[in-house]
Amino acid sequence: MSGYNPQNPKELKDVILRRLGAPIINVELTPDQIYDCIQRALELYGEYHFDGLNKGFHVFYVGDDEERYKTGVFDLRGSNVFAVTRILRTNIGSITSMDGNATYPWFTDFLLGMAGINGGMGTSCNRFYGPNAFGADLGYFTQLTSYMGMMQDMLSPIPDFWFNSANEQLKVMGNFQKYDLIIVESWTKSYIDTNKMVGNTVGYGTVGPQDSWSLSERYNNPDHNLVGRVVGQDPNVKQGAYNNRWVKDYATALAKELNGQILARHQGMMLPGGVTIDGQRLIEEARLEKEALREELYLLDPPFGILVG
């Protein structure tokens, strides 16, 4: 059917109304109420569905800003960041780069000496290591690299952090200096919120940014897909999240439940033609549908990584 593959809130709203029986059945819901149901479904989609988030990285330069260096607070507002999972090791407290620029060979020599390599602290080469086919000892090499990582974590630990998704601020605490680069692994929402998709048209002019964002910038922040629109024209922003089967089903179940709650206020009332209002049945049907969809959503959650140790 034409229009069954929605790419924005308006198209999904029309799909939900048709699913609930419109226009044959009068659905007692306003467009804003349906948009609220869609947004609630998208929020769960982003939190649990494997396609709900995009993995990316954010880079912060401490510079010589005294306040930023002392407080360690970085603003992520407008970046659509859902979570920050870790800080990557760069020149922060690097053992081999004591000042972040010059490389000192003492630690490399120390490891080579432990391995018995000429030129290091040892005087003779008594062990081979590396991925070659002639007496290679890859396990020994792995031990050395693991030991180096452990030394880095002990002597120059990665800073601790706390990200508050409510106010979109990142607090970095611990081992970092001025002029450091802090790179964090972040997860951003892969969809544009309903209010941003619906509310970018006003009057009879064009609103919204006209800049052409790159593909990577649109990946890191889906809001960059928003462009100017002219009143009366269909939106040219396409969002696959609105065409996700689970989102469509759950948003419809929420709309059915809300419609049932509204009709239940007149439960049992006889309408012209002998029709009786039964909002309780809609509420019960929606409850069962929501439970089944929530169980399905938990199964769609990405699995935990495999830990080897």
Curated annotation (Swiss-Prot):
Cellular localization per UniProt: Virion
Chief subcellular location: virion
UniProt keywords, alphabetically: Virion
Gene Ontology cellular component terms for the protein in this record: virion component
Domain of life per record: Viruses
Subunit structure and binding partners: Gp13 and gp14 form a hetero-oligomer complex with a stoichiometry of 10:5.
Free-text function comment from the UniProt entry: Plays a role in the association of the virion head and tail after packaging of viral DNA within the head. Together with gp14, forms a neck at the portal vertex of the head to be ready for the tail attachment.
Protein's name in the database: Neck protein gp13
Organism in which the protein naturally occurs: Enterobacteria phage T4
Lineage: Viruses, Duplodnaviria, Heunggongvirae, Uroviricota, Caudoviricetes
